[in-house]
Amino acid sequence: MNLPERSRFVIYAVGIFVCYFLYGIVQEKLTRGRYGEEVQTDGSVGERFTYALALVWVQCLCNYVFAKVLLTIRPQKEDTTNAGSYVACSLTYLLAMVSTNMAMRWVPYPTAVVGKSAKPIPVMILGVLIGRKSYSWTRYACVLTIVLGVILFMYKEGKVSNLPAETTLLGEVLLFLSLSMDGLTGAVQERIRAASAPSGQQMMRAMNFWSTLMLGVAMVFTGEAKEFMYFTIRHPEAWTHLSLIAVCGVLGQFFIFLMVASFGPLACSVVTTTRKFFTVLCSVLLFGNVLIARQWLGAVLVFAALFVDMLYGKKAPLATAKKPPVEGKLSEEKKLNS
């Protein structure tokens, strides 16, 4: 059954929201909980899970297996995408993730809020410059309004940074690197979509295959693979949390790649950026927390921009609409001449 485009968009977006909401809860239990009864050097009881590379590696491996099984059960036409494109996409994706995790420890709170919320901007800019994508002016305005609205909604007064200037500068450089890598990932995905139009499952399988290999090599060289293995032997109960994270992450990434394959990386970036906004807004509505005027303004901006984008944002410029037939004609002429 072929669902209308807007229905599919809503289903994918809700799937991303729900899966990563549960993912965040379980991840916090894993990374902030303690395992065992041993007394540590700082006097605390129990070990913490500190294996960031291993956590992402387990996730990527499970994502790859899930996509591989889906494609085995329901085979699709061959994916003709160049392997180098997937390698580049996987590398920029992993660099963005690592840079973000490191930057958030070394940037002041306001910078962190802006950095987390501004992801659609480099995705849009580099999608135009490298991915050869074109957007209407309405979509540019809507995306910028959504980013501004999320920043206004999520920002909290009274958080003061005590970080030294050198550390802050390093964090800002890492944050810029993270946003640049996000933009490059989106641009490469746009090129892949334009060149070979793989399905969401095919993109998920290929990107997670290369990500698993890269992370595996990094874990071996850093020694984290051995430390992670010993930790899980000492505390096998950690596998319960890891398994739950894997399930939530697999389903969440499945919806993400369906979104990227059907609507492009910019639409996916907007959905993942507004995810935290909708999570906080739901908690406000459910538990009766009070919003201040600035947060109400941010909420109005986000909803207004999403509504306008839904109505008008997908109308491409005239030049873009005429481009595919021209390219098709040129390729036909090349075939005839050859």
Curated annotation (Swiss-Prot):
User: What's an example GO cellular component term for this entry?
Assistant: Golgi membrane
> Could you tell me which Gene3D superfamilies the record lists for this protein?
1.10.3730.20
Q: Which molecular function GO terms apply here?
A: UDP-galactose transmembrane transporter activity; UDP-glucose transmembrane transporter activity
**InterPro entries registered for this protein in UniProt:** SCL35B1-4/HUT1
Topology of the protein relative to the lipid bilayer: Multi-pass membrane protein
**Family classification:** Belongs to the nucleotide-sugar transporter family. SLC35B subfamily.
Record note on domains: The di-lysine motif confers endoplasmic reticulum localization for type I membrane proteins.
Q: Tell me the function of this protein.
A: Probable sugar transporter.
Task: Tell me the protein's name.
Answer: Solute carrier family 35 member B1 homolog
Which organism is the protein's source? Drosophila melanogaster
Q: Which gene encodes it?
A: meigo
